[in-house]
Amino acid sequence: MTDSKYFTTNKKGEIFELKAELNNEKKEKRKEAVKKVIAAMTVGKDVSSLFPDVVNCMQTDNLELKKLVYLYLMNYAKSQPDMAIMAVNSFVKDCEDPNPLIRALAVRTMGCIRVDKITEYLCEPLRKCLKDEDPYVRKTAAVCVAKLHDINAQMVEDQGFLDSLRDLIADSNPMVVANAVAALSEISESHPNSNLLDLNPQNINKLLTALNECTEWGQIFILDCLSNYNPKDDREAQSICERVTPRLSHANSAVVLSAVKVLMKFLELLPKESDYYNMLLKKLAPPLVTLLSGEPEVQYVALRNINLIVQKRPEILKQEIKVFFVKYNDPIYVKLEKLDIMIRLASQANIAQVLAELKEYATEVDVDFVRKAVRAIGRCAIKVEQSAERCVSTLLDLIQTKVNYVVQEAIVVIRDIFRKYPNKYESIIATLCENLDSLDEPDARAAMIWIVGEYAERIDNADELLESFLEGFHDESTQVQLTLLTAIVKLFLKKPSETQELVQQVLSLATQDSDNPDLRDRGYIYWRLLSTDPVTAKEVVLSEKPLISEETDLIEPTLLDELICHIGSLASVYHKPPNAFVEGSHGIHRKHLPIHHGSTDAGDSPVGTTTATNLEQPQVIPSQGDLLGDLLNLDLGPPVNVPQVSSMQMGAVDLLGGGLDSLVGQSFIPSSVPATFAPSPTPAVVSSGLNDLFELSTGIGMAPGGYVAPKAVWLPAVKAKGLEISGTFTHRQGHIYMEMNFTNKALQHMTDFAIQFNKNSFGVIPSTPLAIHTPLMPNQSIDVSLPLNTLGPVMKMEPLNNLQVAVKNNIDVFYFSCLIPLNVLFVEDGKMERQVFLATWKDIPNENELQFQIKECHLNADTVSSKLQNNNVYTIAKRNVEGQDMLYQSLKLTNGIWILAELRIQPGNPNYTLSLKCRAPEVSQYIYQVYDSILKN
């Protein structure tokens, strides 16, 4: 009977029986009992109470039983750290066992037990195993070093294990070399500035030698390591490429992709005119094509990587377009990827084949695939000018099929073709107008309206067509409403005498009957333009439009170079850099392609070093200026020196969906603000009675837990078409977060959320896009924690801590204001030295000192100091003068502004006196509000 019998028991109270069996004298009985325990553990039963009994079974020569006991230990050691110590002696003993399998098993298990108390006992056995005579033990010990480093990095460095790992790179056994490289690479990821691997020509030669004899996963580790090396010149790059090229014919697709990554990177260093360069390009094509004969899942990963390769070097696969033709039994995700690559490889030479394929695809039954195929025909027309006429003819044939979704997608595509080739294919407009009644999708309706408005002078009944859309104006989507408004204004400017009533009707609907601010504002712009200067209006609205680009979905070059360095990893499948989706990856080293002529440090300089130094200097805050003007200048791309956010992530989202011109006239109305942070009365200016600080005692230690303001409703549902947003701000582990709750009180689901901040006093911006990946259903709420940073554009606001926010979803764009409690902007390095504090206090002019009263506070000086230190307000010194406690404190804001404080506490008096001094006195009243909130919380 198989081991499945252990999973079929339904007995109650079996723990007692298992305990007895584990202590049985017979070895077979104990082995059976341990198997039952492991089975119970596997199905989720709590068998932690058997810990001492299972540990007793470690003293055995039976390898199978030992493995089972070790498995149990790994699972329960974290919850029973004190009892896990019992097993240490057995581990140490097993590390010296004659059997290398047992030695390796022991050191591997000790590395998997993530308990601090055990790590100190692991050092000596691990040191022996790293020098063990058996390669199996050495390779296991190498991985154990990486695991131990993750638990206690300092101890690994102090014990010299990193040096031992480096020594293993020269080991005679290739698997030991591979594991040593894997361990060092893993450690390097968390310490990007350390040169742990010390890659030099000698080490590279050792790795290339080991590459031929490794297992497939060992080869992947070594190839990934090689991809991080920057050869000193093109000769060395060519030499490495020659030794890596045989890996392209490996059976394992992961090895192939790792080899492709190395070659793609080193191609940058080879002279393009050389014969070897062209030969290497030819060698890269067959293995990539071979990957497409695997399982669908492997095909998908390969296609996502090929998509990047084609964008970087289309010449590699330009002759292989046929392998990307879709097969009838391909899954939809493979079909869509193949379609994308086909368009990227389309050229004048192969466009006839591509169009024939696409026309065939447009008759398939899968709606999503058909839509993408029709869109692809349009992309071909835009990309290959010589094929445009043939593409338009193909689209007209598809429109004649009268298949609803095909017709609608074709009209959207034809609009783009009109934009690319103005005044060339307008003869087909009559055919398009025949299908007006069948259009029910917003994109298609908007496209048709745009065509009618743009070519109104060529359509006899353009006014009737647009008027038919106007009948259900309020039922249309925002996209259609905005397009219709613009189209009718265009029509009026072309035929003013015939359409005056129509334009007045649409302007009235847009400005008076609509509650959509984008639509209202665009309506007012047109109204004012038409009423003040019709000539200028004509120049603005009917101006010549820029031609649309060939490829609108190309990845931004810098990001593409980084993704090429991550071929074969998740980043290449997501088309996002690792720090965009790996939690806690702020320290991940950004990779870059090397620069030609072998600049050795091209890929080694960490990104963002200038940012760190610039943050130390206080930022100059410009005046607030015109709010509307600044809203027009909202930067929809990412902050240029924020390494955590890629340009594709934030740059791809345009919150102002109706276009930037829709914001003119839009005002932000602050929502209700908690009274806690209401502006205080203007404080009195006083002089200080500060004396010599050198006699003062030291501050108080820190206790956990900073102040978090209570959540407030920032955006009521009545003002946001059913979307309610409440929230607050927090400061955790050195990072600022915007904690929000989104509630859908509407009758329809909400999707496509995005967020944008206006310029503000402290440069606060989101570090990552808003992460709401699933639709928000009616009456559903979701909590979102949005990481923030202070590297954005700066503009002085009134009040100073005011933050203006735009939130977009599939319904509309909504605006609200909230106040940032300044304690979330207090940084961890805000503690001054006492001498510096005294000198700074004296250096700041007396007129910058402001005094406040904190009323009804019943805390002693130690508690006050502790509460404030939890919020990064540091007590520099404390003394008692005539029974009155005096606390001298410092804090620092994210923009580099220092604030010095003197807090006087009289025992028995609930009113405290707070004196604040800083070089930007307008900040002081907000600091007082924070003090008041923290101490009364």
Swiss-Prot record:
Disulfide bonds: none
Places the protein is found: Cell membrane; Membrane, Coated pit
Keyword set includes Iron: no
Modified residues (N6-acetyllysine): 265
Pfam families the UniProt entry points to: Adaptin_N, Alpha_adaptinC2, B2-adapt-app_C
Record has Phosphoprotein as a keyword: yes
Modified residues (N-acetylthreonine): 2
The protein's assembly and partners: adapter protein complex 2 (AP-2) is a heterotetramer composed of two large adaptins (alpha-type subunit AP2A1 or AP2A2 and beta-type subunit AP2B1), a medium adaptin (mu-type subunit AP2M1) and a small adaptin (sigma-type subunit AP2S1). Interacts with EPN1. Interacts with EPS15; clathrin competes with EPS15. Interacts with SNAP91; clathrin competes with SNAP91. Interacts with CLTC; clathrin competes with EPS15, SNAP91 and PIP5K1C. Interacts with LDLRAP1. Interacts with AMPH and BIN1. Interacts with ARF6 (GDP-bound).
Family: Belongs to the adaptor complexes large subunit family.
Official protein name in the record: AP-2 complex subunit beta
Organism field: Bos taurus
Name of the gene this protein is made from: AP2B1
